Every structure is written in C-alpha cells, then in structure tokens.
Amino acid sequence: MTIEPKGKYMESRGIFLYINHNTRTTKGYYYVRKTTDDSKGRLKDDEKRYPVKMEHNQIIPTKPIPNDKLKKEIENFKFFVQYANFKDINDYKNGDISYNPNIPSYSAKYQLNNNDYNVKQLRKRYDIPTNQAPKLLLKGDGDLKGSSVGSKNLEFTFVENKEEDIFFTDAVQFTPSEDDES
C-alpha cells in the first residue's frame, strides 16, 4: 500500500516473497519505504527491509524485529489473494478492456464504488485517508488461463494527482526456476 497525503512524503509498505515451487520454500522481505528530501532538496528513498518466510499461510520474520507494533504488522500481513474475491467481476460496468493474443497480454480498467467487496477489504486492512472510490487496473502477460511464465498485476488507485497519490498494488511474476547444480 502506498500513501502520499497532500503536503506529506510518500510511504509504502509491503512484502516481496519468492516462492520455489520445486522445494516448496519461501524467502523474502517486508519493506517500509519512505520518500523524503535530501539536504539538496532532491527526492530520495529510505527503505528498511525485514527478512521473512511463509509457513502454513503465515508470514514469519526470520530475524528479531525491534518494534512490537511493526512485528505484529508483519505477522498479520495477508496477501491480497488471501482475502480478495472477484466473483462479481462480470458485473463491473464500463470496463476498458484490451487483449493482444500475439504477445499475449491483457489489461482491464474499471471505476469501482466503495460498496465493492475488495474495496471494503482494503479499507478494513489499511488506513486509506480518502473516501474517493478507486479505479481498478488489471494487467498481465502470458496465457490468460494461467501459465508457468508471465505476470499478473492489479492496482487500486484511490487518488492520483500532483499533490497526492494513494494506491494499492499487488503482482505475481512467474519465472522458471533455475536448475540446482549441486
């Protein structure tokens, strides 16, 4: 989730998790990224990473976390796929949809309302400082039916302008595993 309220700096929080399907192991990190100004007034990113793994659908820090609130935040983290539900996607109105079978790639954009199940779930889990309903953007490449390579991305954009940005993103990148030469 990325939030940049009007007149304040941007802050992003989330997880990168690498899953090895062959060994059924995971490793990754939870990050907190703040964009601030340096001494010369240029934007700079300050990112802190906390190593994690996933076992039995739970995120577990692999090193001690100095802050109890942050530790709870990491342990309670859920990926969007763990709570999302797109059963009503066929009811979404006025979608701007494109598909290129030659690549193959697709994108779909919808204006949602605040009564949408997924919007309610995001508002329940994150302190989203606007009542504005988001736009949903779905993008991907690779076979639509699922594939061993390709990517799937989604973004809920609540506010996007020069003064503030508030959005939620989630992505899955499928890459072939490298053979173990041990």
Curated annotation (Swiss-Prot):
Any Pfam family hit: DUF576
Gene3D superfamilies to which the protein is assigned, alphabetical: 2.50.20.40
Family: Belongs to the staphylococcal tandem lipoprotein family.
NCBIfam families for this protein: SA_tandem_lipo
Protein name: Putative uncharacterized protein SH0120
Lineage: Bacteria, Bacillati, Bacillota, Bacilli, Bacillales
